[in-house]
C-alpha cells in the first residue's frame, strides 16, 4: 500500500513547521487537518514575538523555518521591547494582519511538496508495538513511517462561556474527539490544561481619542531582514481597567467556570485571565490593556490582557467599564478552552515518544503555550520525524545552543505542571544566545541537517568574517589615548560615531555594525558566559549509562534517586536540571561514575 514517510496531524504553528521541515529532507509528507483553509490561523493574539519569543522566532528563522517569513510579510506594526535594557533581553514584537498571516503561511508551505489532506485523525495505527500510520474518522488508513501529533488545543477540547460549555477545539471548530484515547493506549500520560482568549471588539464602536496611542517604529523591525510593505502602517493603543471593572469581576466570580470548579485544567501562570489578575493582584487599582488591530481591512480590534471565561452578558458590562469602550460592541466573546496534553517527560530531546518509536509531538499538546513555542517544537519534531523515516539518528539542540534547546530541555528534563511559556529569564546564556546572532549559532546546524542550502552558510560566514575584521581594526586603532575597542566600551560612545571619525575601508551593514558594538561593549560579560558555557558542556559530556540503578549509588538521597529513576537523564548536565537533585547528589553521582559504574 502506498503511503507517506511523515504524517503531520494538525495545521497550526507546530504542524506547519513540522511539515515544512520534514519536506526539506525530501521525504513524502502529508498534513492532515479538519479545515485546510484554517492552516496557520491565529486563534489568539494577532502578533508574533515579544520577550523570550522573538528569540525563538529568530532561531526558527536560522534553522530554515517559515514563521519569521510569514510574520514579516503580514506585519502591520513593529516595536522592539526592552530597548532601554541590554541586548540579551531586547525583543522584537510584530503585530500582523491575522488573515494575511495565515495566507502567507499557506503560500510558503506550498513551496514544498506537502500533501494537505482534509480530515480528522481518529487513532494511531499500531500493530505489534509498531507505528504504521494513522486512521481517520471517515475510515481512511494513512500508512506512515513517522507521525507528528500537533493537535494544539483540539485534543478532547471543551470551550467555556461562563458555566456553559460545549466540545470544541476553539470557537466554531470541532475538537479531536478520539485521538486522546489512542495516545493513552500507547501508554502516554495525559493532563488537562486550559487557556483563554479575549473578546474582539467592533473597531467603529471604540472611542480611540480616549486611548493612549502607541505608534509603530520607523524604520520597522523584522525577523528576516525583509520588512513587509505594511510593517509601519498602523498604531496600537493602550487603556486600563477601572474600579468598576474590578467590582464587576469580584461580584461575579461564582459565574466563572474556573472559580466555580467546573474547569479542571491548569491555566498559564504568565498569561492569566482578567479575573485571575483581579483576584491574584488584589492590591492593584488597575491593569494595563493593549488594543490591537486585527488587520488592515478588518473591523475588529483585539483586547490583549482581557482574556476571560465569564458569561457573555457580563463581558458586555466589563468591556464598557473601560475608558474608550463605553459604547463598545463585542463581535466575538472571550472564552476559555480546556484540552488534553501529554507529559513531555515521556519524550526524547528530539520530541519522539519514548513509548512508541516513530511517534513525535509538538506544540500545546506537549504542554506549552504560545505560537512561537509551538513553531520551535514543530520544526524539531518534523526534522526528526523525517530523519526517522530515512533511518537517520535523532538530533537535538543542547541547552547551551539557545532558546529552543532550553525550551526542549525544560520540557523533557523537568516537565511542566502548567502551560509553559518561554521567557528570557529561563536562559542561563541569554547574552550569548541573542536573537541577533541566531544565524551565527544555528545556520551551520541547519545546513548540516539539510534544512537550508550551503549558500546560506557562506553568506553568514562572510558576515561574521567582516565583523571579526572590524573588531581587529578597532583593537589596533588609537582613539583619545586608548584602543578603538576600549573607547567604544564607554557607555556614551557608539560605533556609528567611531565609524564616522575613522571609517572602515568598506562600510558595514546595520546588522554587522550592531554586532561590532555589542561584542565591544559587552566583551567582559560575554567572556564570563562563554566560561559558563564550557562548564555546561563539560557536564553534558559526563554521560550516564542507560539503565543505571540510581538507588544503588552511594551517597545519593532518596528523593534524587527517585527523580533520576523517573527522568532517566543521559548526562550530569541533565541530572543537574532536575528539581530535587542537589549539588551533593551530583557529587555522589560523579564519584560513582568516575569509579567506572
UniProtKB/Swiss-Prot annotation:
GO cellular component, as recorded: cytosol
GO annotation, biological process: tRNA methylation; tRNA wobble uridine modification
Keyword NAD (UniProt): yes
InterPro entries documented for this protein: FAD/NAD-bd_sf, GIDA_C_N, MnmG, MnmG-rel, MnmG-rel_CS, MnmG_C, MnmG_C_subdom, MnmG_C_subdom_sf
Subunit structure: Homodimer. Heterotetramer of two MnmE and two MnmG subunits.
Function of the protein: NAD-binding protein involved in the addition of a carboxymethylaminomethyl (cmnm) group at the wobble position (U34) of certain tRNAs, forming tRNA-cmnm(5)s(2)U34.
Family annotation (HAMAP family): MnmG_GidA
Protein name (Swiss-Prot/TrEMBL): tRNA uridine 5-carboxymethylaminomethyl modification enzyme MnmG
Natural source organism: Thermus thermophilus (strain ATCC 27634 / DSM 579 / HB8)
